[in-house]
Amino acid sequence: MNLAGQSGDAGSGHLLFANFNQDNTSLAVGSKSGYKFFSLSSVDKLEQIYECTDTEDVCIVERLFSSSLVAIVSLKAPRKLKVCHFKKGTEICNYSYSNTILAVKLNRQRLIVCLEESLYIHNIRDMKVLHTIRETPPNPAGLCALSINNDNCYLAYPGSATIGEVQVFDTINLRAANMIPAHDSPLAALAFDASGTKLATASEKGTVIRVFSIPEGQKLFEFRRGVKRCVSICSLAFSMDGMFLSASSNTETVHIFKLETVKEKPQEEPTTWTGYFGKVLMASTSYLPSQVTEMFNQGRAFATVRLPFCGHKNICALATIQKIPRLLVGAADGYLYMYNLDPQEGGECTLMKQHKLDGSMEPANEILESASHDRPLVAQTYSAAVTKGTYVPSSPTRHAYTEDLGAVGGACLEDETNSLRLDEDSEHPPMILRTD
């Protein structure tokens, strides 16, 4: 998630970007000085597995699972995507686009580049542009989600700038799959589960989170995170088994919902006055306005987390580390917070460790005083950082943008194209294409 534009202190380390990889086993961090990868195999130690200082002002850095393939965008060249083999320190290829790159999504089949009013679908094996979705509704936040499942390889993005419509696109067969009327307000967050069969959505209002079946678009679950105030949802994330869904926002509370269907018990005739009254009350809900009836049927949080800050943009993930379910929160204050989740009882989650995203660690009982509740909310989009003056015009590239192509690739290193297997996390997909 983009954290550019944070008006911050030295504690944030000039953080511009943070995101978990597809299976939540590593964390990528982009900053003014370059980018880093951290392993998430331990709670006690945040192990730095790689650091690059060759590229400054890294505003997007996405790693393909645990492979060496990484996609990078810099504020100094915001229209240029570089695909690199970070362990070898080599650039595989690059592409230039017609506008600022707002988001990049990866799985083992596709690479998606999101611009404000278009989406480019690349074949990750050779980086050819397979399809371009043009003239999408304005999407200045670069909101989109890509399923990590090879068989259910769907892309979700806003279908409207004024209401919460979700467009679902099949990136394998390159055709529209469905349009889901998810919310009345514009979309704020999207997330697929690992199987690609569920999609979680939240609107700018931020009070209700819904889960739909994919590609059918049937509403499966509806959760209410609150009724007192509207919030800005920063992040939605499923656990890898699809049983839990976390939602973080610009408030201090992270909600975790359990995706379970309550089995209906056979109806029995009430034998007491209270039982009869309860039956009448439930029957009466059918006469209430639909909005009120929905509130009766909405699920509540199974577990919650109280963050030591309020107002920071953040990214959350549900991961199993050392055989224990954890909630991970990477925040614009430059820290990664690790909480334990009780999968049976839920309730308030326990803060186990907090790590600085420079690799150092602080005990759970030493919460920083600087993480106060009156800190301003960070800029919501990468484009906001550009408009604040961070943008520096990029140097001329080998290929200029042309309207016919939309995305133009640079040279590819030939020695990177041999003997590389897509299903090996220690390697990356073979890049065999060269430009037209």
Curated annotation (Swiss-Prot):
Keywords: Autophagy, Lipid-binding, Membrane, Repeat, WD repeat
Keyword check for Calcium: no
GO molecular function: phosphatidylinositol-3,5-bisphosphate binding; phosphatidylinositol-3-phosphate binding; protein-macromolecule adaptor activity
Domain of life: Eukaryota
Ranges spanned by the short sequence motif L/FRRG motif, renumbered to the chain: 223-226
Subcellular location as annotated: Preautophagosomal structure membrane
Domain remark text: The L/FRRG motif is required for recruitment to PtdIns3P.
Family label: Belongs to the WD repeat PROPPIN family.
Protein name per its UniProtKB record: WD repeat domain phosphoinositide-interacting protein 2
Lineage: Eukaryota, Metazoa, Chordata, Craniata, Vertebrata
